[in-house]
Structures are given as structure tokens and as C-alpha cells.
Amino acid sequence: MSIVEYAFFQNAIIGSLLASIACGFIGTYIVSRRLVFISGGITHASFGGIGIGVYLGINPILSAMAYAVASAFGVQWMSRSVKVREDSAIALFWTFGMSVGILCSFLTPGFMPDLPSFLFGSILTISHADIVLLAAVTAVVATVFTLFYRTILSISFDNTFARSQHLPVSVMEYLLMALIAMTIVSTLRLVGIVLAMSLLTVPQMTANLFTFSFRRIIAASIAIGWADCLAGLAISYWLNVPSGAAIIFASIVIYAALRTIKSAVRKFK
């Protein structure tokens, strides 16, 4: 029986496609706005929501999503309204989320069998419910970017100009922060907390080798991201290693190879 005939692998392929689409949109905004550190903070802060979910006996992905959105809003509010340095606000929510997650993990009776999959990702843990959640998040992200593309483009490259044009910058920033948090949490089953940030940045870096157009980077990063995921899933299956690490390893190797090829071609022109 071929591996692609197994339901868990089909879920992984579908999930990786949906994750690539969502991360293609959101990751391009993150890289353009230089919000990589914020996305890393939200990713690790979401561990607090996972711990709370496990401790209370509720769906840890849903509790992590709520916690991640709250953390994203907290960072945005502290850096804009309270005038706390953005990196300090990120560090605050990052470390607090991790501490809450660790405390809840130790206070939960018994053993947390899903903990490694949340940290490192696993194709075996992607369920139909995870696919539905990913599909919903992807649909919301794609809809928002389609409806507000010009506003998002203006905010991404020139926040001051966007405000001068009376665009709803603050509202859009909070909305995009929520979408960043939702996208991150919805991909945790695939790549895990430790490596989720790379799925939002490496495909965009690879696409940026060939184009500087915001729209084209989105399209290219979706295709590159899915190729990275498929290569990583194959490595994960053949070597029996965590899918998250395999996907990110494959994505960085592909990026390095393409960058080397581009440099070599340019050198010998």
C-alpha cells in the first residue's frame, strides 16, 4: 500500500497546502513590515494557551489561538498606546506565555502525550478537525487580503503615507496581528512552536531572490512553501523524524541552493 493512500498522509498534504497559502499571504506582510521578531514572540507565547487548554481539558489549539490573539493585541497595544518599546513588549508576552505553558503542563495530572507534536510538529497528529481549522483560517486570510489589498500594501511599505491617506491603519494593524496569531497557531500541528516562524519567512526570502513585487512574492511564496512542505514531509517519512524540523531543513536547503545558483549565474554572465 502506497504512503499517499493513508489518511494521515493525505491530511498532511492537504494541511501543508492550506498552511502554505495562509503563510504565503501573512508571511509576505510580516517580512515587508519587518515583524519577524513579533511573529516569533506570538509563536512562543501561544504555548501558554496550549498549557491552559490541556489543564482545563479543552481543545488546546483553540485555547492557544485565543491566547495568541490576546498576546498579539497586547504587544500592539503596549507598543502603540503605553509607549513600551516593541521588543520589550514582545519579550514580556513571549516569556510569560512560555512560563504559563510550563506551569500548566506540570500542574496537569498525568503525562502530556501531545506535547512533542506541539513543540516540533508531527504529520501523524494532523486530524480532520485541524484541516477544517486551517481551511477556515486560510479562507479568512485570503478574503481579507483580497478585499483590503491596497490598504495592506500601503501599510506594509509606508505606514505614515497610509495614515496621511486616511486609511484605517490602526484597525488594519490589529486585524493583521490577529490573522498572524491565527495563522501561526493553525500551523502548529505541522511544524510546531519551535519552528513555526520559519514557515512565515523562508519561502518569502526564497521568492525575494527572483521578484520584489508584493503580489508576486505572495504567489511565489505559496508555491515555494508547498514545495518545501512536500519535501519536508518526504524526509520526515523516510527518516522517521519530526515533520517540523524536516520541513524547515528542506526549505533552508532549497533557499541556499537557489541563492547559490543565482549568484553563480550572475557571476558568469
Question: How would you label these PLM feature ranges?
Answer:
Residues 6-11, 82, 90-150:
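Transmembrane helix-bundle core of multi-pass membrane transporters
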Residues 13-18, 61-66, 91-92, 131-136, ...:
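Hydrophobic alpha-helical transmembrane segments
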Residues 28-111, 207-219, 236-239, 263-264:
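Short loop segments and helix-boundary regions at transmembrane helix junctions
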Residues 190, 194-245:
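Transmembrane alpha-helical segments in multi-pass inner-membrane proteins
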Residues 15-24, 45, 49, 53, ...:
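Alpha-helical transmembrane segments in multi-pass membrane proteins
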Residues 19, 130-203:
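Helix-loop-helix "hairpin" substructures at the membrane interface of multi-pass membrane proteins
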Residues 241-248, 252-269:
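Cytosolic-side transmembrane-helix boundaries in multi-pass membrane proteins
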Residues 1-21, 269:
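Membrane-interfacial amphipathic/re-entrant helices at transmembrane-helix boundaries
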